[in-house]
Amino acid sequence: YDNSVETFIMRGVDLIFIPEPATAQMLREHGLNALCVRQFAEDGYDDYVFYFSEMIRQIWGSDKAVSEKIDMWQSDFTTALNTVKQTLDAHPEIQTQTLYYINGEKDRGLGYTDLGKSLLETVYKALKIDFICNRFESNRPSVEAVLEIDPDIISIGGIYQKKRLNELYSTEPWNQIKAVRENKVYNIPVGFVGFEQTCSASALFIYSQANQIYPDLFDFDLVALTQECLQKYFDYTLTDNAAQNLLDGYFKDGSFMIE
């Protein structure tokens, strides 16, 4: 996370997308082109999902290949969301489960999360999941606040996810949470960024969580879907083993992202 002016100038960066408005303003004051694109929306994320892709279309849409990829991404996301939603809607007997999300993108412990109004909340709503993080006053809830709700499921994302997972099972009173006791703790894969962010793999986030939360209903071929995604958007070929390692929260060679 090197946001220094010197780094961007040295790399000859033409345009910077960044989620922090203060940093974007600072970069602009130093003559760099910086746009603030946030990963949440005050009025809810459902109508904001395509905002970033449409911004890219405005900037580079004169290139037919770019516009076609934007259409492809929007279609992939919509298809994934509708597929899981329609399947779950056909099963009214399914009970809503509560979920706590641990943001492992930075090394900030088990009490670092997302407050909702984000892609996470949009996806979990389609998955018939009660995303409890939107109840907290800050993105650093106490263990007592999480224990009070006692979530059925915990999902962990980010490059520190294995470190967080080990802490979760070995640290009291975190390991007394229902999700931990019943072994309903799921990882979120990381590609170029975490799948739970608005990114090329957003559709894969939907499929992977559906597989983990509802294994009796969904069995998407995540290895094939991941390979297809990387090939389609980046012309990058991933072996079966590399794709599986990525899905399991490791580097493609099977090593830990963070020791």
What do these predicted ranges mean?
Residues T23-G109, N187-I258:
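Extracytoplasmic substrate-binding proteins
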Residues L115, P141, L204:
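Short, well-structured alpha-helical interface segments that form or flank functional binding sites
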Residues Y1-G61, N134-Q176, K252-I258:
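Acidic/His-rich segments in extracytoplasmic proteins that coordinate ligands and/or metal ions
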Residues D89-I94, V123, E144-E148, I177:
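Short, conserved, surface-exposed binding loops centered on an aromatic residue
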